[in-house]
From Swiss-Prot:
Name of the featured protein: DNA-directed RNA polymerase subunit alpha
Stretches the record annotates as Alpha C-terminal domain (alpha-CTD): 248-333
Gene name of the encoded protein: rpoA
Function in brief: DNA-dependent RNA polymerase catalyzes the transcription of DNA into RNA using the four ribonucleoside triphosphates as substrates.
Domain remark in the UniProt entry: The N-terminal domain is essential for RNAP assembly and basal transcription, whereas the C-terminal domain is involved in interaction with transcriptional regulators and with upstream promoter elements.
InterPro entries from the UniProt entry: DNA-dir_RNA_pol_insert, DNA-dir_RNA_pol_RpoA/D/Rpb3, DNA-dir_RpoA, RBP11-like, RNAP_asu_C, RNApol_insert_sf
EC class (word): transferase
Catalytically driven reaction(s): RNA(n) + a ribonucleoside 5'-triphosphate = RNA(n+1) + diphosphate
Alpha N-terminal domain (alpha-NTD): region residues: 1-234
Lineage, broadest ranks: Bacteria, Pseudomonadati, Pseudomonadota, Gammaproteobacteria, Pseudomonadales
Record's keyword terms, sorted: DNA-directed RNA polymerase, Nucleotidyltransferase, Transcription, Transferase
GO process annotations (BP): DNA-templated transcription
Assembly notes: Homodimer. The RNAP catalytic core consists of 2 alpha, 1 beta, 1 beta' and 1 omega subunit. When a sigma factor is associated with the core the holoenzyme is formed, which can initiate transcription.
Top-level division of the source organism's lineage: Bacteria
Family per similarity comment: Belongs to the RNA polymerase alpha chain family.
Length: 333
């Protein structure tokens, strides 16, 4: 077969060697020289960081107030239990979030099989050990399982609801990716007289919730979708439409002095660079209470004055500050 020097080779041979139910080696050849590392590295990064899956994101354990606690009759401390929960391989069918319960007492090993499951929840590794109980031990907990992608630290899920969250609900850093290990090597390949070609060998292991071959297929699809925009790239760019800012309530552009607060409260706000009413309403009560010399009495005064104007703390303004609001104005407010 004669190939033009300007024509790129495309892989014609794909081999899948199943090592175990959760591990496989995928071989792709032939590739032009250098394309083995180009494709291998791109697929590896997608498999590690962008694959969707399910994981425990929150745990509530009876008698536990924080992760540094110890439970009587339980061999592991709370931190070890939380680490073990991260090893659960869970599949949700048709749901994005679910709450599961686990309850066990008496001497023995607590495993994933002890979790009470709904009909649309599946645990792939039921033998996974969560804790070990003594004869006087008992473990009761609620687990929140959610669907996500890649790795998500607990603090990235914090929201306004955190202030009302009951004590003892422990947030977990979650790895949603079903991929446990991914490595690739590039070997030499030959087509007729050409001996400088690449052969890509990907060694992939998952947690069992996703078949390794399907994981590669999904990663390749993600890469294809991201590159599709370049395929249709046109030289003539479309005119940019400049959207006008949404009209802002004029009262938000007025200085906080117009609220006629006490001198103490007004000075505290200015010390925190809060010059306009629009600046003030975006602050929360917790943030204001952290302001030096601003106590609960001043906070109550601020809330009452805002309420009389139909405003409140903790509001969100998408287009603040507006372009018409000059920094120089703040300096003279």
């Amino acid at each position: 077969m004669q190939i033009s020097v300007n024509e790129f080779l495309t892989p014609r041979h794909i081999d899948v060697q199943v090592v175990s139910p959760t591990r496989a080696k995928i071989t792709l050849e032939p590739l032009e020289r250098g394309f083995g590392h180009t494709l291998g590295n791109a697929l590896r990064r997608i498999l590690l960081s962008s694959m969707p899956g399910c994981a425990v994101v929150e745990a509530e354990i009876d008698g536990v107030l924080h992760e540094y606690s110890a439970i009587e009759g339980v061999q592991e401390d709370v931190i070890e239990i939380l680490l073990n929960l991260k090893g659960l391989a869970i599949k949700l069918h048709g749901r994005d979030e679910v709450t599961l319960t686990l309850s066990k007492k008496g001497s023995g090993v607590v495993t994933a099989a002890d979790i009470q499951l709904d009909h649309d929840v599946e645990i792939v590794n039921p033998d996974h050990v969560i804790a070990n109980l003594a004869s006087n031990g008992a473990l009761n907990m609620k687990l929140t399982v959610a669907r996500g992608r890649g790795y998500e630290p607990a603090d990235s899920r914090q929201s306004d609801e955190d202030e009302s969250r009951s004590i003892g609900r422990l947030q977990l850093d979650s790895s949603f990716s079903p991929v446990r290990r991914i490595a690739y090597v590039v070997e030499n390949a030959r087509v007729e007289q050409r001996t400088n070609l690449d052969k890509l060998v990907i060694d992939l292991e998952t947690n069992g919730t996703l078949d390794p071959e399907e994981a590669i297929r999904r990663a390749a699809t993600i890469l294809q979708q991201q590159l599709a925009a370049f395929v249709d790239l046109k030289g003539d760019s479309e005119p940019v439409v400049v959207e006008q800012e949404d009209e802002i309530d004029p009262i938000l552009l007025r200085p906080v002095d117009d609220l006629e607060l006490t001198v103490r409260s007004a000075n505290c706000l200015k010390a925190e660079n809060i010059y306009y009413i629009g600046d003030l309403i975006q602050r929360t009560e917790v943030e204001l209470l952290k302001t030096p010399n601003l106590g609960k009495k001043s906070l109550t005064e601020i809330k009452d004055v805002l309420a009389s104007r139909g405003l409140s703390l903790g509001m969100r303004l998408d287009n603040w500050p507006p372009a018409s609001l000059k920094k120089d104005d703040k300096a003279t407010a």
